[in-house]
Amino acid sequence: MIKLSTVQLAQILQAKLIGDENVQVEKINTDTRKSVSNSLFFALKGEKFDAHQYLDQAVSQGALALVVQQENSSISVPQLVVKDTRIALGELAKWLREKINPRTVAMTGSSGKTTVKEMTASILQHTAADSEAVLFTNGNFNNDIGVPLTLLRLTEKHRFAVIELGANHQNEINYTTKLVQPNAALINNIAPAHLEGFGSLAGVVQAKGEIYRGLTKNGVAIINAEHNHLDIWQKEISNHAIQYFNGKDYSAKNIHHTSQGSTFTLISPQGEIEITLPYLGEHNVKNALAATALAMNVGATLTDVKAGLEQRSQVKGRLFPIQVTPNLLLLDDTYNANKDSLCAAIDVLKGYDAFRILCVGDMKELGENSLAIHREVGQYINLVNLDLVCSYGNESAVISEAVSGKHFTDKTEMVDFLVPLIENQLQQNKKVVVLGKGSRSMKMEDVIYSLKDKIKC
């Protein structure tokens, strides 16, 4: 953040200022468990927490000023009193985005948005010829708190911002996209994910479409031609220009998949170029097209795209390859899962000439359709004919049932079952590939990294 005085902050937030007008801050904090020293502390309040209980702690740890909803007479540092500290956090983030005014892109989708974010940021780092000139979302900071905190990291050095928007209920993206004000916005795909919050696939379509409401006046709406719901999104897109990836504007041909990634010819409005992509799977070729569309709409060239896509390294938890031995490959795709992303990962696994093992955990937040969706995955696995499926969790049991696999209620038991089986395959000089996949709460990486540590062949 740039340096601001408490009187400037009061004006931006339309807050009542109590205390010194000239205290200067350039750091934001919302959590006393992290470094609060020399920061402006926002006392956020939610259904299950209230940071107003920790004001004394924030001050004792070095907070220079506080943003609060109620004045506290015992506090010695300046207080900025607002009606809602969460909204105030967003207002400050919006003000800073407008002040710095970087070329900004935003993406959402049911899966792949983090990979698209990483790819886009990599491309734009080449456009800027400076990795420090590109701000991008860290981790899962993609909700109504994380997005403002991301924007509040903006400084005058930033020329580009790449912001990921997530949601598990209606109107969440409607709020965050209006803070971000993207010059280009993209929906990567639509799938049955977070159905407990959205209610139905139609609810997902509507919620993701909210991203286009925040577009700047000349902003571009980018749509996946394979997930085109323009009839529903037309109101949000209004008079904005529309481009398509996996379609007429950005596409791929001559696609070849290898154990290290993919090669393809990228087709774009700027022309064609050969890409060697260090990401596994057909779906990541599509993610690369999405990233290209976003980056080109804020100034990237074909040369930037090639450099950015080819130099980006794999990300743990997202089809991250772990070559344990020449004959044993573990695929860590454990960050999260929905039906489409799971089937995409299975497509990668089926392409290996090896003994192919799927270790799958439950897909969460699917509501009343959860068991049916898990069964559909089992039916899909039957079509691709994997060698072994091991499941863990309550609902993934139906996947094992559908494919005559093995179900476990304990991950340690799964590992203990797999270790001798895999070692036996390796002793016969056979290749083995193990894919781990499941929703974040299932922590299927426990299985993958235990196998890495325990297999001795």
Swiss-Prot record:
Keywords: ATP-binding, Cell cycle, Cell division, Cell shape, Cell wall biogenesis/degradation, Cytoplasm, Ligase, Nucleotide-binding, Peptidoglycan synthesis. It catalyses: D-alanyl-D-alanine + UDP-N-acetyl-alpha-D-muramoyl-L-alanyl-gamma-D-glutamyl-meso-2,6-diaminopimelate + ATP = UDP-N-acetyl-alpha-D-muramoyl-L-alanyl-gamma-D-glutamyl-meso-2,6-diaminopimeloyl-D-alanyl-D-alanine + ADP + phosphate + H(+). InterPro entries: Mur-like_cat_sf, Mur_ligase_C, Mur_ligase_C_dom_sf, Mur_ligase_cen, MurCDEF_CellWall_CoF430Synth, MurE/MurF_N, UDP-N-AcMur_synth. Transmembrane segments: none annotated. Pathway: Cell wall biogenesis; peptidoglycan biosynthesis. ATP binds at residues 109-115. GO terms for molecular function: ATP binding; UDP-N-acetylmuramoyl-tripeptide-D-alanyl-D-alanine ligase activity; UDP-N-acetylmuramoylalanyl-D-glutamyl-2,6-diaminopimelate-D-alanyl-D-alanine ligase activity. Its main location: cytoplasm. Gene3D superfamilies: Mur ligase, C-terminal domain, Mur-like, catalytic domain, MurE/MurF, N-terminal domain. Its EC number is 6.3.2.10. It is found in: Cytoplasm. GO terms for biological process: cell division; cell wall organization; peptidoglycan biosynthetic process; regulation of cell shape. It holds the Pfam family Mur_ligase_M. GO terms for cellular component: cytoplasm. Belongs to the MurCDEF family. MurF subfamily. Involved in cell wall formation. Catalyzes the final step in the synthesis of UDP-N-acetylmuramoyl-pentapeptide, the precursor of murein. This is UDP-N-acetylmuramoyl-tripeptide--D-alanyl-D-alanine ligase. It comes from Haemophilus influenzae (strain ATCC 51907 / DSM 11121 / KW20 / Rd).
